[in-house]
Amino acid sequence: SQSRAPSTFGVADPQLVSLTSDMFLTSTTWYEDKANAAIPFSTQVTTNGGWGGETTDPEAVPWGSVGAYDIFDRPVYRNMIFSDVKIPMGTNALFEDCWFIGVAWIETTEACTNDDWNYVGARELGPGGVPQLRFPEMTVDINGTTYSDTTPFSNNLRFDGCTFLGTLAGDRPLEYTHWRNKVQLTGNTRFFIDPEDEDMLAEPDAAVLQGLLLAMPEANREEMAKTSMMLPGWSVDVGNFDSDTTTKVKLSGTIVTGLIDVRGSADIHGTLLTT
């Protein structure tokens, strides 16, 4: 059979969307307003049956990398459905097989300008595989208070096998802090907003996907069609380190990030804009 590149890019000219800096230089966007007006994250988690206390084993960042620079014990949210949600700063979670309908807004501290913000609280595996601080002497001042960990004021998230019917967006970090403000998309993660998307209609659950999209106000779909990902200043990793071509992250539309790393089996149809 004909081989296929693990990462592909392509879009027809009529699909290209014109972007301006005004769309992402302020945090008071249409996307954030939608998330602010929605049911709180904690309430939506409770509605989905609640968090049962499950966490990952110390998980490497980047995920699957032998050269990890930090580790996280992530709370795991599995098989949950969120509708227009703001993910609070400090969540640092793994979302597994979750659905995000509408806007998913990631909250973080925008004024992360301290030179050591990336490193304060960073951990590594020490003797016996026990987590230990990588830089135990480092602290950071936040609003006049000294802290030994910046993870509660940041957001490092992994979405595995999730479905986004809308836009993934977030506060804009004023400095590129990829150890702390990072989004990783792994597994069969999907983004759709067009109810007539040919790729979506080929999915086994196409009827459900299309029904949810058609249930949205058309004006909302048009707004979210401007960008499937609005994460200026963020580090975004798309795809998997392994070579398993049965798992593929599919992105479409305009993707706005601080820096995006596409690896493994990823399929991107649209425009990439890094800030």
Where on the chain are the PLM-derived regions?
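Long, polar low-complexity repeats
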Residues: 26-33, 37-275
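Core solenoid repeat modules with strong leucine/isoleucine-rich periodicity
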Residues: 2-10, 15-21
